[in-house]
Amino acid sequence: MYILKKTNNIEYENVSLREELKVFLQSNGIPVSALAEQLGIDRRFLERYISEGGDIKFAQAIKIMQVLDIEPAKFIQGFKNDLEGTSEEITDESTNLSFLYSRFDIPSLKEIGLIKKRAKIDEIKEQICSFFGFQNIYEYDTFAILPEALFSRSTRYIKEQKSARMNEFWLKCLYHSFKKIDNPNPFDRELLEEFVKHIYEYTTDEIHGYEKVILVLYNLGVTVLTQPYVSGTGKYGATMIIDGKPCVVITDMNKKYHKLWLSLLHELYHILNDYDMLQKIAYHITTKDNPDLFLNEDSADAFALNMLIKQSDREELPQIIRLSHMVMKAAKAIHVHPSIIYGVYLEGLDSKKQSAEFRKYGSSSCLIGTEKAIKNVIFDPIGLQDLRKAIELMRQEFKSAV
């Protein structure tokens, strides 16, 4: 069915409602039966309409348009005579559905476990409200209102609508979390610049070293949250300036010890060298496939490598990397964990050679994981199913640094 209606002066655009609905159901993983139940439309009729087409009542079309976020007002004038005398109500359920699927990437939220796989619409609303502490799902629009530059750039940064929804969800959670943590320490750039020079030494303590660095940074006015990878975002890290203080997100995407430190130092580079630009653009996201045009990612990567192992020492790595006892000796001499040597060596190779060398040195005996390092500082609202609880746990952890 195409919605088409001519009046004396206006011809309304042909819109294949059936095709739009098919795409919507497929992209969001919604069963026809669930949509039919929620909209109060006979399931067999809706299935037949989607597969074969045919006539559909105007009131039913309006419900579907609301779910698809098609403005019904565009068509109401042309169909106003059809509206008169109809006894079928257009309920709020279609509006609820439209809100949910226009604001949230439901399939991704199911994938990360925030929403149960077979949850119905009411259950989806309840689970999202429980996560945020909402009384009503519509509170999402006024929750953690992002600064104008932050919001406009987030919509510009991710062009696909599906990614944009997950990206905004991610940003809202983080922005709200940083605001609630509310680091009381003033940002001390000079001390940060000096401290960064010594961060490599903390890598030798694979259990408490990373935690100690995070707490020192907090005292310097830099708040760092370390999170598991959130499906649908593809972000290695991010830096925001909130209330005049740097706020950093490190994503434990690869679960590799050396990557954790490289990601942290990468973001600290931007704080030290791009602070004024960060204030103007509101935030910076580090991602492999979409480099930031405002900031120099190559310089940040080089800085991170140099802060862990200086260039002159890195030049010696190809000669010793095959001999584990030499790697251990070098690690002790330059005060880093052996895993850092293997990791930095691999990161410095071109992609073709890196793949071959990774097969030799990518095992857990060379590249250790991050589980021990981030145990006490992991920020995992998704795992806890509760954003407020995750924030409170981090606030308690940061209190130990004051």
Regions found by a protein language model. Give the residues of each.
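Active-site hotspot residues in diverse enzymes, especially metal/ion-binding acidic/histidine motifs
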Residues: 2-263, 268-402
